[in-house]
Structures are given as structure tokens and as C-alpha cells.
Amino acid sequence: MPPPATPAQIQPPAPTVGAAPAVAAAKPLPASLARRTRIGFYGEGQLFIDAESNKTARLPELVVSIDHRPNDWLRIVAALEADDVSRLALQQAFLEASPAPVIGLRAGLLIVPLGLGNLSPEPTSYLTVDRPLTDQLIAPAVWRELGVGIFGEVGPGLRYQGQVLSGLDGTGFSAQAPLWGGRGDGGRLAVRDAAVAGRLELVDLPPGLVVGGGGYYGNATDGLRAFSGLHVGVVEADARYKKSGFDLRAEYARLYIVNSYLVNNYLGLLGQDAVPSRGYGVYVQGGYDLLQLGGLDTPQELVMFAGFENINPRSQMSQYNYNPPAITPAGQLAPEAPSPSKSLIRGGIDYRPRPSIALKADIQIEVGTEGAAPAPPMVAAGAPGTPRALGTDVADAARGGTRIGLALAFSF
């Protein structure tokens, strides 16, 4: 019997029958194939209004997935993602063999099991309009790489995952979301830059509580001699509790980029654009289903929630000097100053007429910054490359600030 599915896997329910007439020439699927194949679909539409009343509407992601089980221990999963309606890519695609609950194997394009945003990427899995910044800028969701992995359950409620993956591409690192542009997304296989990732979690001890944590470590040279010695590490811990109307969660993530000055030298990134050596994010959030107050027996939910987040993707910079030295427009040596941290408060309502549909409204307020002031603008000559542009949703998230958000999310 296969082990229980982990949150990073997409296992949508069986498709609803009769939404559209069948094509006349099409043949129905054999009964055995239909029973073993599930087709899923999830996505989200968002509207944001900032403090200056500027409005931004977007479709951050639409995902279609197929989950097929040829037999009781073999599984094939593929998910196709349209990102901001501008990029079509595989979100995950793997072959899984699970001969026993204690051990299973996967190979293909795997989701890295770090952060709640990667463990449960569906927009119906979180209450806020968009993911917390920690899950966008520190442990960037949805983070996927080519590789092989093992998973299983050992003992009551103790689950594990381990992966050997293709490494990150250091030329895609940035100041605002350090690792986001370095993800391979299955587009390349950097064998020389192999990385490892893993996760342990305790499930339902007590019922409704999931506590876990994990880590990632790997090279990010992408075969470039200029990046020799560039290493990346991420550590993360999280907790979730959902029972009796309560929806509570917390997460902490910290990233390390060893010798990040190598990227800054190669790309000519200076001052506020320089890639950091450390960054972190932490948030806590709590919600309660108001429909539970009256003791109503209904599948609907009306969750009021509030949360706090503190984040700094550039909490520490490399102490090595640039080569050649970077200078300010005034002719001074360029400091490698970290950025101040951001503190955000979010609150709102998440209404679910059914578990697969969510209508969300929230407000995000930036309540202050702490730490060093932003570094002055820098200039440098002869930069050999340019950093990879951030996605629209990640770039908007990195700016932070006060805003109101509305969303319709679904997962079938």
C-alpha cells in the first residue's frame, strides 16, 4: 500500500462529469483507466490597490495536472503551469514508485520541500490573497528542480523526504529575491552543481498539528570558473494547526549565499542591486472560522485572519571587496551595506462556499523598517552580464508597502 501523499504532491479530486458535451469522434476512456487517472486544475485571479490608489490586476498562475496510477505502487504525475499568463512551463513531472509505506522513490522534475508555499502551492491552501513574502523571496515558491528523491513514513506520523537535485544558476541571483531567478525549473541539468534537500515532519501529533523543517545545500557555479566557491544553503521550519475552526501557521526561513561577491563581480551588481550573503523571513498567522461560533453544520467557511511578518532578503552582505573596486558617483569606495528589514501586518477575510473555492480580501500594512539605511547608488564599468528579470508577482511582492488585495482562488 503506498504511503500517504505528501503536501508537495498534486492530487486533485476526480473530474466533475458533464461540464461540456463530448466530441462525437472521441472514444470514452476504459473504465480501469478512468478510475486510476485524476485531472486537476487550480489558479487564482488577483486585484491589488496600493496606497496611491493604483490598481493592478493579474492571473499569477493557472495549473493543470494529471495524476495516473498504472497500479497500486506506481504513479505518474505531470503539471503544466501558466505563470502570469506570459510563460508556460512544467511545474512538476515525475515517476513515483512506492512499494511500501516506509520507502518510495521519485525521479523527474521535483518540488523542493522547503516552505509552506512549496509544500502546498495551491492558492486555496493559504488564507491571504498572495503568499507571504517569506515564501516568495526566501524559499521561492514554486521551486522545482530535476532530480531523484526518496520519501516515506517511519513510525506514527513521522514523514521524511530526501532529494538529490540539479543545482542553482548563480547568474540569476538578485538583490530583491536572491534565489528566485536561479531556479532551474527543469530547463537545464547542472550535474556538476548537484544539490541535496530534505525534510522531516510530524503529522497529527496531536490531531490537526503538522510540525516540520528542512534544508537545502548545493553549488551554484553553473559551470563558470568565475563562480568557483559559490554555495547556497537554506534552512526552514514551519508549523500548521487546523482544527475546530482554528487555522494557525508559522514559518521561519533563512538563506545563505557563500561568496556572493563572486556574482556581484561577474554581473557588476553594486549597492542596492548587490546579491546578499544572508537573508531571512519569518511570519505568524492565525484565523478562525466565524461560522463555527453558531455551531452551524455546514461545509462553508468564513475565516477572519491576521498575521505579522518580518523579512529581509539582504540582511548581510559579503565582506570581500569588489574586483575591480566599485565606486560611488562621488568617487568613494562602494560599501556593501545590507538593506533594512520590513515588518508587515496583514488581516482579512477568506470565504469558502466549498473547500475548492475561496473568495479573499485582505489589507497589508508596512509598519516600519529596521536596520541599516539603503546603500547609495553605485557605478561600475564593464559589467559582463545582467541579472535575470524578476517575475511580475515577485517584483511586486519585493516592493512591499501598504495595499489592499482581492482574489478568487480555486482548486479542483
Label every PLM stretch briefly.
Residues M1-F48, Y160, Y322-P325, A330-Q332, ...:
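N-terminal periplasmic/intermembrane-space "pro-region" immediately following the signal or transit peptide
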Residues K27-G170, R192-V210, Y283-G294, P299, ...:
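Outer membrane beta-barrel
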Residues I49-A51, E96-S98, N118, G208-F412:
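Outer-membrane beta-barrel pore domains
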Residues N54, L137-A141, R188-V191, F227-G229, ...:
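Short Gly/Pro-enriched turn/cap motifs at secondary-structure boundaries
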Residues T124-P132, P178-G181, N265-G268, N323-P329:
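Short glycine/proline- and charge-enriched loop/turn segments
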Residues Q136, R183-G187, Q272:
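Active-site rim elements
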Residues S166-P178, R188:
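Charge-patterned, long linear interaction tracts outside catalytic cores
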Residues P178-A226, L230:
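Loop-centered beta-sheet repeat module
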